[in-house]
């Protein structure tokens, strides 16, 4: 699973995913990309599920770039525990995704647009947010 090797603080403040993405909103590597239409926290398991789905469909003919990484830890207190007594232990790692951020980029060596678009469509079903598939050169 994806998670940082080391962090400065174990339990950081929660970050807002409101507003538009400031960085990584341009397609750099691939021909097609999956772009977020809304903001959310995306967990390391969801990112991994997308990666597996795309790689399985494209087999060895394509390359996938993942532009998000789960840097933020979300904490949770155990069930049936009273309020207070600290924040709770880190439960999962999430990536903060804002509107317009390029999540995944795909390039197929056989230059088959169908394969690239289908791989991104399969990945979009694994995510909890609305996304759109964008071609390189088109405004995100």
From Swiss-Prot:
<comment type="subunit">
    <text>Part of the 50S ribosomal subunit.</text>
</comment>
<protein>
    <recommendedName>
        <fullName>Large ribosomal subunit protein uL16</fullName>
    </recommendedName>
</protein>
<keyword id="KW-0689">Ribosomal protein</keyword>
<dbReference type="GO" id="GO:0006412">
    <property type="term" value="P:translation"/>
</dbReference>
<dbReference type="GO" id="GO:0019843">
    <property type="term" value="F:rRNA binding"/>
</dbReference>
<dbReference type="GO" id="GO:0022625">
    <property type="term" value="C:cytosolic large ribosomal subunit"/>
</dbReference>
<dbReference type="InterPro" id="IPR000114">
    <property type="entry name" value="Ribosomal_uL16_bact-type"/>
</dbReference>
<keyword id="KW-0699">rRNA-binding</keyword>
<dbReference type="GO" id="GO:0003735">
    <property type="term" value="F:structural constituent of ribosome"/>
</dbReference>
<dbReference type="Pfam" id="PF00252">
    <property type="entry name" value="Ribosomal_L16"/>
</dbReference>
<dbReference type="InterPro" id="IPR047873">
    <property type="entry name" value="Ribosomal_uL16"/>
</dbReference>
<dbReference type="GO" id="GO:0000049">
    <property type="term" value="F:tRNA binding"/>
</dbReference>
<dbReference type="InterPro" id="IPR020798">
    <property type="entry name" value="Ribosomal_uL16_CS"/>
</dbReference>
<dbReference type="InterPro" id="IPR016180">
    <property type="entry name" value="Ribosomal_uL16_dom"/>
</dbReference>
<dbReference type="InterPro" id="IPR036920">
    <property type="entry name" value="Ribosomal_uL16_sf"/>
</dbReference>
<keyword id="KW-0694">RNA-binding</keyword>
<keyword id="KW-0820">tRNA-binding</keyword>
<comment type="similarity">
    <text>Belongs to the universal ribosomal protein uL16 family.</text>
</comment>
<comment type="function">
    <text>Binds 23S rRNA and is also seen to make contacts with the A and possibly P site tRNAs.</text>
</comment>
<keyword id="KW-0687">Ribonucleoprotein</keyword>
């Amino acid at each position: 699973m994806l998670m940082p090797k080391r962090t400065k603080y174990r339990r950081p403040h929660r970050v807002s995913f409101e507003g538009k993405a400031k960085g990584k909103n341009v397609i750099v590597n691939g021909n097609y990309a999956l772009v977020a239409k809304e903001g959310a926290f995306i967990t390391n398991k969801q990112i991994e599920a997308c990666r597996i789905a795309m790689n399985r469909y494209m087999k060895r003919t394509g390359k996938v770039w993942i532009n998000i990484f789960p840097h933020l830890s979300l904490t949770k207190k155990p069930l049936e525990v009273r309020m207070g007594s600290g924040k709770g232990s880190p439960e999962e790692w999430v990536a903060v995704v804002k509107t317009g951020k390029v999540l995944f980029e795909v390039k197929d060596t056989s230059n088959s647009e169908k394969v690239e678009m289908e791989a991104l469509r399969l990945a979009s079903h694994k995510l909890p947010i609305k996304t759109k598939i964008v071609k390189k050169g088109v405004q995100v």
